[in-house]
From Swiss-Prot:
One GO-annotated biological process of the protein: glucose metabolic process
Classification via Pfam families: Gp_dh_C (PF02800), Gp_dh_N (PF00044)
Main location: cytoplasm
GO CC annotations, alphabetized: cytosol
Gene3D superfamilies (UniProt xref): Dihydrodipicolinate Reductase, domain 2, NAD(P)-binding Rossmann-like Domain
Claim: DNA damage is one of the keywords in the record: no
Organism: Cochliobolus lunatus (Filamentous fungus)
Presence of keyword Cytoplasm: yes
EC numbers for this chain: 1.2.1.12
Molecular function in Gene Ontology: glyceraldehyde-3-phosphate dehydrogenase (NAD+) (phosphorylating) activity; NAD binding; NADP binding
NCBIfam families: GAPDH-I
Enzymatic reactions: D-glyceraldehyde 3-phosphate + phosphate + NAD(+) = (2R)-3-phospho-glyceroyl phosphate + NADH + H(+)
Protein name in the entry: Glyceraldehyde-3-phosphate dehydrogenase
Length: 337
């Protein structure tokens, strides 16, 4: 059974989730809501993308709806999630990708319109967070609102799980070298809460905060309080990289650690955790479906208990694919797929 999904918020993640769904045989997007984009503009934004290229399919506007590859996608422009008629569209699940309704209470408004479950495509202060390949099997059908966590947590957590399961992480620090995003400025502008964050994204490396490392403790409870981190926003349009430095209890050579990650990437974490010994750079991974691609050549170890590991991720495409994978998984548990 195909999982019927609605998207609220047709920004970067909303549109990339839609594009991913076209390639995902188990998901059908039946409705989109965005109060700030009318249907013709939505069709244009879906068709043309500066980062991921032109949409490989047919997009038309039919009245107030979109027709994508011959299938009707209902389009609404409601500001209040409670007013979106999800039940009329057939959308059982909703991807909440506005970045606004990220708490359980706010996201639950979608249920008033007939949706049964909401997946927030961002970290949440109170909704349970899931990372595919790490803790997705803890999902229970009585959960109505859940979070797919962040793109960085989706990169970090699978790698941390492999290392912790094999060698036991004592403590660690993470830095994500992160491509700029829509929250940043094209030219210097006001940013009262984060002065450096207001500087132009295309000219600067900007130190910033991130909760991604601490969030790993929510999806891997044994690591709660053992990891923290920061971000460096850099002048690249897409694809980011995690630098994880950890002390491990059970000593291992760097070659042994590489082998452990390689085995996991070919086994239980296949499709989620990747492994490469190629001399890759950011653009080589644009459009990569995986959550985390371990760079075997980029890491180093000081000794058998202190190691730096490097793993790449497409912070748009790979993350959006995991949103859909999570939807398909919970639909199976719910008996709807």
């Amino acid at each position: 059974m195909v999982v019927k999904v609605g998207i609220n918020g047709f920004g970067r993640i909303g549109r990339i989730v839609f594009r991913n769904a076209i390639e995902h045989n188990d998901v059908e997007i039946v409705a989109v809501n965005d109060p700030f984009i009318e249907p013709h503009y939505a069709a244009y934004m879906l068709k043309y993308d500066s980062t991921h290229g032109q949409f490989k399919g047919d997009i038309k506007v039919d009245g107030n709806n979109l027709t994508v590859n011959g299938k009707t996608v209902r389009f609404h422009m409601e500001k209040d999630p409670a007013n979106i008629p999800w039940s009329e569209t057939g959308a059982y699940y909703v991807v909440e990708s506005t970045g606004v309704f990220t708490t359980t209470e706010k996201a639950k408004a979608h249920l008033k319109g007939g949706a049964k479950k909401v997946v927030i495509s961002a970290p949440s202060a109170d909704a349970p967070m899931f990372v595919m390949g790490v803790n997705h099997e803890t999902y229970k059908s009585d959960i109505e609102v859940l979070s797919n966590s962040s793109c960085t947590t989706n990169c970090l957590a699978p790698l941390a799980k492999v290392i912790h399961d094999k060698y036991t992480i004592i403590e660690g620090l993470m830095t994500t070298i992160h491509s700029y995003t829509a929250t940043q400025k094209v030219v210097d502008g006001p940013s009262a809460k984060d002065w450096r964050g207001g500087r132009t994204a295309a000219q600067n490396i900007i130190p910033s905060s991130t909760g991604a490392a601490k969030a790993v403790g929510k999806v891997i409870p044994e690591l709660n309080g053992k990891l923290t981190g920061m971000a460096m926003r850099v002048p690249t349009a897409n694809v980011s990289v995690v630098d994880l430095t950890v002390r491990i209890e059970k000593g291992a050579s760097y070659d042994e650690i590489k082998q452990a990650v390689k085995e996991a990437s070919e086994g239980p974490l296949s499709g989620i955790l990747g492994y490469t010994e190629d001399d890759i750079v950011t653009t080589d991974l644009n459009g990569d479906n995986r959550s985390s691609i371990f760079d075997a050549k980029a890491g180093i170890s000081l000794n058998k208990n202190f190691v730096k590991l490097v793993s790449w991720y497409d912070n748009e495409w790979g993350y959006s694919r995991r949103v859909l994978d999570l939807l398909v998984y919970i639909a199976k548990i719910d008996g709807n797929a």
